[in-house]
From Swiss-Prot:
Main location as per UniProt: cytoplasm
Binding site for substrate: G63, G64, R85, N178
Gene symbol of the encoding locus: argB
Protein name as it appears in the record: Acetylglutamate kinase
Organism: Prochlorococcus marinus (strain MIT 9515)
GO process terms (BP): arginine biosynthetic process via ornithine; L-arginine biosynthetic process
Length: 283
């Protein structure tokens, strides 16, 4: 890279850095990026860079592949219905062990290695994520968010720490729930008055033509996002992600992004460049 290109990149990023300094950005970390060492390291550096220029990142994570590995080790067959993991008591124990004890700490360790300061917590800590049983209970201990109590996060963010949160919630009676990390991220973004919600996925973003990767919808508004759902342009796995973004925007988040986590440094490319890399939905 020659000097003029370096200067051009920095010049393009500067107004975004100035605009988002002091603002909170919630990032849902998941998908293939969690399985690829090179992508993981790039993600940790991206989060560290955001923090170093004054942005306040908050990371929400799932950990499906790691959960499946541990279920396999314990000779338990994973069960899914309508894309959601059926979670009985034994599976919930493993989900808690894996998300809180392994995946969360791996992310914290990775970010801390960059020189930034991450703090690992779960939705159980300080009743951060309160939940109830999802739907008719046919998925067992799968839950949905009823309330976010962000008081635990506020002093951490104010002191420059990066919260890393596992997507487990609980009822007022202390019953734990496994919750979709996308929806946790959306509800949390609204609760902490975040500037942005960013979902890292295994797709380029929202496609206008389902099987055409060149048909990426770069920037749409809330009304257009709803029309995409009505016209079945958005469906399958992209449907809950888009619904999550719509709900977050309706609750005051300024912008929501669905981006391809399989591209190295996609987070920085989306936030700090004019063209971005995925789909941005504006309120």
């Amino acid at each position: 890279m020659d000097d003029s290109l370096r200067v051009s990149i920095l010049s393009e990023a500067l107004p975004y850095i100035q605009s988002f300094s002091g603002r909170k950005i919630v990032v849902k970390y998941g998908g293939s990026i969690m399985e690829d060492e090179k992508l993981k390291k790039a993600f940790f550096r991206d989060i560290a860079l955001l923090s170093s220029v004054g942005v306040c990142p908050v990371v929400i994570h799932g950990g499906g592949p790691e959960i499946n590995r541990w279920l396999s080790k314990l000779e338990i067959s994973p069960k899914f219905e309508k894309g959601l993991r059926v979670t009985d008591d034994k599976t919930m124990e493993i989900v808690e062990m894996v998300l809180m004890g392994r995946v969360n700490k791996q992310i914290v360790r990775g970010i801390n290695k960059t020189g930034s300061l991450a703090v690992g917590i779960s939705g159980l800590d300080g009743n951060l994520i309160q939940s109830r049983e999802l739907g008719d209970g046919s998925h067992g201990l799968v839950g949905e968010v009823t309330q976010i109590n962000p008081e635990l996060l506020e002093p951490l963010i104010a002191k420059g720490y990066i919260p890393v949160i596992s997507s487990i919630g609980s009822t007022t009676d202390g019953i734990s729930h496994n919750i979709n990390a996308d929806f946790v991220a959306g509800e949390l973004a609204a609760a902490i008055n975040a500037e942005k919600l960013i979902l890292l996925t295994d797709t380029p973003g929202i496609l206008k033509e389902r099987n055409n990767p060149n048909s990426l919808a770069k920037q749409i508004n809330l009304k257009e996002a709803r029309k995409f759902i009505e016209k079945n342009i958005v469906s399958n796995g992209m449907l809950p992600k888009t619904e999550c973004c719509i709900r977050a925007l309706a609750q005051g988040v300024r912008a929501a992004h669905i981006i391809d986590g399989r591209i190295e440094h996609s987070l920085l490319l989306e936030i700090f460049t004019n063209s971005g890399i995925g789909t941005m939905i504006n309120a």
